[in-house]
Design a protein with these regions (language model features):
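Hydrophobic/aromatic residues within the transmembrane alpha-helices of Major Facilitator Superfamily
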Residues: 14, 18, 51-52, 88, ...
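Alpha-helical transmembrane segments of integral membrane proteins, especially early/N-terminal helices
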Residues: 37-46, 82, 111-123
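Selective transmembrane alpha-helices of multi-pass membrane proteins
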Residues: 67-98, 157-170, 175-208
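Cytosolic-biased juxtamembrane loops and peripheral soluble domains of multi-pass membrane proteins
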Residues: 91-120, 176-178
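Core segments of transmembrane alpha-helices
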Residues: 120-132, 192-195
Length: 208
C-alpha cells in the first residue's frame, strides 16, 4: 500500500471516528455511572461490533447484506428499539449513590456492558453501506488483500478505541461534578433524550 493512500484513508477514518454517536454517548454515560473499567468494556463491545461490520464490508459480504431490504430493516428496527430502551432506562435511572459490588456482580456487569456496547455498535445498518462504499476507493487489487485488511482494520481500531476511551475518561472525570445535587438527574434526562432521538432517527433511515 502506498503512503498517500494510507494517509487519505486515515483522514477519512479520523473524520468518521471523531464524530460523536450513540457508542460515544454510551461510553460517556457508562464512565459517569460505573467507572472507567466498565466504560472501557463497553467501548470494546462497540469496537468488536464495528470491526465485524468492517470485515464483512471488506470481504464483499457487506454488499450482500446492504442490498437486502429485509436484513437492513431487521438491523434498523432492532437497533432503534434498543436505543430507545436505553433512553427510557436513562430517564428512569436514579444513580445518586454508589455501592461496592462483589466479584460475581462485577463479572456480570462487565458482560452486560460488553453486550450493550456490541448492540449499540452494530445498531446502525448504514455503517455496512458506508464501509462497502469506502473500501473500493482505497483497495489495490494488485497488492496483498490480507495485508491491506490488516492495515485498514488496524488503523480503524486505533482511532475508534482512542475516541471511545476519551469519552469514557471524560465521563469518569466529570462524574463527581455531575453527581452533585440535581445534576445527575439532568444528565440522565439529557442522555435519555439523545438515545431516544437517535433511536427515532434510526427508525426512519433508509438505504439511500
Amino acid at each position: 500500500m502506498q503512503l498517500d493512500t494510507w494517509i487519505y484513508y486515515t483522514l477519512a477514518i479520523l473524520v468518521l471516528t471523531a464524530s460523536p454517536g450513540p457508542s460515544s454517548l454510551l461510553c460517556l454515560s457508562k464512565g459517569v455511572s460505573s467507572g472507567f473499567r466498565l466504560a472501557l468494556t463497553t467501548a470494546l463491545g462497540s469496537l468488536s461490533a464495528i470491526t465485524i461490520i468492517l470485515t464483512l464490508s471488506f470481504t464483499g459480504l457487506g454488499v450482500v447484506i446492504a442490498s437486502s431490504e429485509f436484513v437492513f430493516n431487521i438491523i434498523k428496527w432492532c437497533g432503534a428499539a434498543y436505543l430507545i430502551w436505553l433512553g427510557i432506562q436513562a430517564f428512569r435511572s436514579k444513580q445518586n449513590d454508589f455501592s461496592k459490588s462483589d466479584s460475581a456482580q462485577v463479572s456480570t456487569s462487565h458482560v452486560s456492558a460488553y453486550i450493550s456496547g456490541f448492540i449499540v455498535g452494530s445498531s446502525n445498518p448504514k455503517a455496512i453501506i458506508f464501509f462497502t462504499a469506502l473500501f473500493p476507493q482505497f483497495i489495490d487489487p494488485t497488492a496483498s488483500l490480507l495485508t491491506q485488511y490488516a492495515i485498514f482494520a488496524g488503523t480503524f481500531v486505533v482511532f475508534e478505541l482512542s475516541w471511545l476511551t476519551f469519552y469514557a475518561l471524560l465521563g469518569v472525570k466529570t462524574s463527581n461534578w455531575l453527581f452533585e445535587a440535581g445534576r445527575a438527574k439532568l444528565f440522565n434526562r439529557l442522555t435519555g433524550g439523545v438515545f431516544i432521538s437517535a433511536g427515532v432517527m434510526l427508525s426512519t433511515a433508509n438505504r439511500s
